[in-house]
């Protein structure tokens, strides 16, 4: 008995030891479900868990069917040495992968295990980005734009809302390159209950729009974060820092948004870096095309097209194989596109490779087999790239960039040929990026490795361009200034003598700007000749003999050397000085006859201010000056002021005003002089064309009147050339004329003009453009057209307008009445003071202008119609029938952005109208009136109103 019980006891002890050494399967499974990070071991044939996760998902293996039939064999294989096989970088693991790659095909279809999904989630932040690559379904959707893009959020109750449709109508196909150039991305939110939804509109560098649906659960979060009101249209413009830059409660023109963005300092840098961006974008030919994409959170709808794009790029990629490893990488990218194609084409791609070790070919083929049987998912990219990046720190940015990028950006980020195209555009960066591209062929580095060297190299490139610009300016400045003497030599009658004198002085003193000053002196003297003809004829007779002697001397100088000519010039100069001292009469004659020598003599002794004094001397006592500086001729403030004074040509002429305009920066300016004269006055010519670009003269003129800035600036002087008023912004010429009419010199002129019967008559017909430019950015127009003044609708509208002068004035409204049919037409313009006073100025509108205005606004003369024109010149609303109350019109105007700024200024100044004029809608009760009265009334006039910001 003892002998028989001995083996049994030994058997029991052995079984107890074996059972005690195995881990409990249920505990392991519970740990995985609880969220613990499990070892890198798969329960299937001791293969690494990461590879089995890919194959399991690709085959769709379900966890329940994977565990139950094979539970016991998997448990028997779990032992201590399995931890060594968990390292995916060891060579034995790769042989196991190759040997076991075909086994999942014999299994039933199911999903990957929950334990493996938890393992993927806990690996790194990269896995989260893979699940939410675009951010369209991620709660931190705005974080994907931070630091890179400006975000334009449009919120509306539903897609058929009036303001929303109007805003989308402004987004024509030709505006998206401008938006892309400013790095603007769009988010559209619909927040009405039951219709919640939205979309993310990403604008590519080619102007293409990639639309992705937005998770409806994110709408309330975004609405509360951006402080958008439910049930109302609203827009928010976010900076790149995700701070609110501007809010719009109504549709606005894109130019207004551009203006807000372009004021930022970062925008100036973007303009410099992106020169020619809009032209390249429009040349791509895809601007405004909308491409609908699915939500990338599950690797859905957008993937097949992404794979097809990579297929198109593959031939270019395969043409540049730098090493064997890069060729293998090409094969893997080809294999990644295989889901869109049948399985057989992947095999000839593997065979077309150049001769390589057998391990490389078998490894690439096994990858193709693994990926080809399933739709392409986000985990395929890290699998193919793992053997080529030994350090894991480089790999996550690459995979993140690949998955989060949209269709155009994939081709840019994955394939070096696009980067080489970029380097061809910037030749100065060819040195350092060449190293980066060679590195990319081995490691598939993230895009940041390429962008950093290129930006560093681009910096010196920009400075180098600036230095070249400086050198060009340096070479150009000496040539520009000596240029004027050449035409100056051709004008005087004494050509040879003048050429000789100028050349000698140039060689002796190296004064580059003297010829322009001498020519200026000559022009001033010639301009004074017709004023004293009788005296000058006598002076000519007295000075004929010395003139002949000097001509003989000048002829001899042409034959002599330069030294002799200089001596003779000095003698002639001494004689002229002596004659000056003897009599004042001879002085005037000398300046006229010897004018070609005296300016040069003066130039040696006179200070530089004398040239400015000579210029201003021609205006002193005769003309009033309006001096204007502007950065360029297209400057908005200058254009506004120019249009203003050009409309008042006759009034400028009667007040004897000359306008001197200086364009450009302080150190490189050009000048323009306009004289406003009556028909009976002789045309003035003060300076020659060469003097208009004389930098010394212009700089002295700037200093004389303190106009040393590059901004718009305007100075008004009287006939004594003393400053009477400075203007930093454009001003209406009526204000300028009122100021001039208070001058003592002007009062005398007015009395003289009345005696002589000088009356300002506008001979030319006023054009429509000039008429409308008078109100642009200054006044809003309320145009009322009727067939006659007895029309019922017209009379009803006039009764509604009575007593509204204060409200019209504070809102900068001008009423334009157009009456008549056929040839018997006419009009009246009513101007209301902007301070709210009841004084109204009326002007008659000629018949031809009435017809032009009706044609321009498409107004029929047969029927009553009224329309509101904003300060930007666009029609804001139409009224085919009379408005019994002006409340609706006022509310529409008060909702405009520019009007809100005006209201803030007027409130600070205490400017307001009595409440009874506005039926209880005073300024202090504006918000209540806007919400109570406007919302109800607006629905009845929704077909007429168009909300614009001006």
From Swiss-Prot:
Tissue: Expressed in dermal papilla and dermal fibroblasts (at protein level). Expressed in heart, thymus, placenta, pancreas, colon, epithelium, spleen and osteoblasts.
Compartment(s): Secreted, Extracellular space, Extracellular matrix
UniProt entry tagged with the keyword RNA-binding: no
GO CC, any one term: extracellular region
Key word Transcription regulation present: no
GO molecular function terms noted in the UniProt entry: fibronectin binding; heparin binding
Coiled-coil residue spans: 560-587
Post-translational modifications reported in the UniProt record: Phosphorylated.
Bias (Basic and acidic residues) ranges: 104-119, 308-317, 418-428, 462-478, 487-499, 538-582
Gene induction: Down-regulated in cancer and after osteoblastic differentiation. Up-regulated by dihydrotestosterone (DHT).
Predominant location: secreted
Skewed-composition ranges (Low complexity): 348-374
GO biological process, one term: extracellular matrix organization
Xref: PANTHER family: COILED-COIL DOMAIN-CONTAINING PROTEIN 80
Oligomer and partners: Binds to various extracellular matrix proteins.
Protein family: Belongs to the CCDC80 family.
Name assigned to this protein: Coiled-coil domain-containing protein 80
Species: Homo sapiens (Human)
This protein's encoding gene: CCDC80
């Amino acid at each position: 008995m003892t002998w028989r019980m001995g083996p049994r006891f030994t058997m029991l002890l052995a079984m107890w030891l074996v059972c005690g050494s195995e881990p409990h399967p249920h505990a392991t499974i519970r740990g995985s479900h609880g969220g613990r990070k499990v070892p890198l071991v798969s329960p299937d044939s001791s293969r690494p868990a990461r590879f089995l996760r890919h194959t399991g998902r690709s085959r769709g293996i379900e966890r329940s069917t994977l565990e139950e039939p094979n539970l016991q064999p998997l448990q028997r294989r779990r032992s201590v040495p399995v931890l060594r096989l968990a390292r995916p970088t060891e060579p034995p693991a790769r042989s196991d992968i190759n040997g076991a790659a075909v086994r999942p095909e014999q299994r039933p279809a199911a999903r990957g295990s929950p334990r493996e999904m938890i393992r993927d989630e806990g690996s790194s932040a990269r896995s989260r980005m893979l699940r939410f690559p675009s951010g369209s379904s991620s709660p931190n959707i705005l974080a994907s734009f931070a630091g890179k893009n400006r975000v334009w959020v449009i919120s509306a109750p539903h897609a058929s809302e009036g303001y929303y449709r109007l805003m989308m109508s402004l987004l024509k196909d030709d505006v998206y390159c401008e938006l892309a150039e400013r790095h603007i991305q769009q988010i559209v939110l619909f927040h009405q209950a039951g219709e919640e939804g939205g979309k993310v509109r990403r604008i590519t560098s080619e102007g293409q729009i990639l639309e992705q649906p937005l998770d409806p659960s994110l709408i309330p979060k975004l609405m509360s974060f951006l402080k958008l009101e439910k049930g109302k249209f609203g827009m928010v413009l976010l900076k790149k820092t995700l701070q609110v830059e501007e809010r719009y409660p109504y549709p606005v023109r894109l130019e207004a948004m551009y203006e807000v963005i372009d004021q930022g300092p970062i925008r100036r840098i973007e303009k410099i870096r992106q020169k020619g961006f809009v032209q390249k974008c429009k040349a791509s030919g895809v601007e405004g095309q909308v491409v609908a994409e699915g939500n990338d959170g599950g690797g859905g709808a957008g993937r097949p097209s992404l794979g097809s794009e990579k297929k198109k790029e593959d031939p270019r990629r395969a043409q540049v194989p730098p090493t064997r490893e890069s060729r293998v990488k090409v094969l893997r990218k080809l294999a990644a596109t295989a889901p869109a194609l049948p399985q057989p084409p992947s095999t000839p791609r593997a065979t077309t490779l150049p001769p390589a070790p057998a391990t490389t070919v078998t490894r690439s083929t096994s990858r193709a087999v693994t990926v080809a049987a399933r739709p392409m998912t986000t985990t395929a990219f890290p699998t193919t790239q793992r053997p080529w990046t030994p350090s894991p720190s480089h790999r996550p940015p690459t995979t993140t960039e690949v998955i989060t990028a949209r269709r155009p950006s994939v081709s840019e980020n994955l394939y070096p040929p696009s980067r080489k195209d970029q380097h061809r555009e910037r030749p100065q960066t060819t040195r350092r990026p060449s190293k980066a591209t060679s590195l990319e062929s081995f490691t598939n580095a993230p895009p940041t490795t390429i962008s950093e060297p290129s930006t560093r190299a681009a910096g010196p490139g920009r400075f180098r361009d600036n230095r070249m610009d400086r050198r060009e300016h340096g070479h150009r400045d000496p040539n520009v200034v000596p240029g004027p003497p050449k035409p100056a030599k051709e004008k005087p009658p004494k050509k040879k003598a003048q050429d000789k004198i100028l050349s000698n002085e140039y060689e002796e003193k190296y004064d580059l700007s003297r010829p322009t000053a001498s020519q200026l002196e000559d022009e001033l003297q010639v301009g004074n000749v017709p004023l004293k003809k009788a005296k000058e004829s006598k002076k000519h007779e007295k000075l004929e003999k010395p003139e002949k002697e000097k001509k003989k001397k000048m002829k001899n100088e042409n034959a002599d050397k330069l030294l002799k000519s200089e001596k003779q010039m000095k003698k002639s100069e001494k004689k002229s000085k002596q004659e000056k001292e003897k009599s004042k009469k001879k002085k005037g004659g000398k300046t006229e006859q010897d004018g070609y020598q005296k300016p040069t003599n003066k130039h040696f002794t006179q200070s530089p201010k004398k040239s400015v004094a000579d210029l201003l001397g021609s205006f002193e006592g005769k003309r009033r000056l309006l001096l204007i500086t502007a950065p360029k001729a297209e400057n908005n403030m200058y254009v506004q002021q120019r249009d203003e004074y050009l409309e008042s040509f006759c009034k400028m002429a009667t007040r004897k005003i000359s306008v001197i305009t200086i364009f450009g920066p302080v150190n490189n300016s050009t000048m323009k002089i306009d004289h406003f004269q009556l028909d009976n006055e002789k045309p003035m010519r003060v300076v020659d064309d060469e003097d208009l670009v004389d930098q010394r003269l212009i700089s002295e003129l700037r200093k004389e009147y303190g106009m040393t800035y590059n901004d718009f600036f305007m100075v008004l002087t009287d006939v004594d050339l003393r400053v009477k008023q400075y203007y930093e912004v454009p001003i209406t010429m009526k204000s300028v004329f009122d100021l001039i009419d208070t001058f003592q010199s002007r009062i005398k002129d007015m009395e003289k003009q009345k005696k002589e019967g000088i009356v300002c008559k506008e001979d030319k017909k006023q054009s429509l453009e000039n008429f409308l430019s008078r109100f642009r950015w200054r006044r809003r127009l309320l145009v009322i057209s009727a067939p006659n003044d007895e029309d019922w609708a017209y009379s009803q509208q006039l009764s509604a307008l009575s007593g509204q002068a204060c409200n019209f004035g504070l809102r900068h409204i001008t009423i334009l009445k157009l009456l008549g049919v056929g040839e018997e037409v006419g009009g009246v313009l009513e101007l209301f003071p902007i301070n709210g006073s009841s004084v109204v100025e009326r002007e008659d509108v000629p018949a031809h202008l009435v017809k032009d205005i009706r044609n321009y606004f498409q107004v029929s003369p047969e029927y009553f119609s009224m329309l509101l024109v904003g300060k930007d010149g666009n029609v804001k609303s139409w009224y085919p029938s009379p408005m019994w109350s002006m409340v609706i019109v006022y509310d529409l105007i008060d909702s405009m952005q520019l009007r809100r700024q005006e209201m803030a200024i007027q409130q600070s100044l205490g400017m307001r109208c009595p409440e009874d004029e506005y039926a209880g809608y005073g300024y202090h009760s504006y918000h209540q009136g806007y919400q109570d009265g406007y919302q109800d009334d607006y629905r009845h006039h929704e077909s007429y109103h168009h909300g614009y910001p001006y």
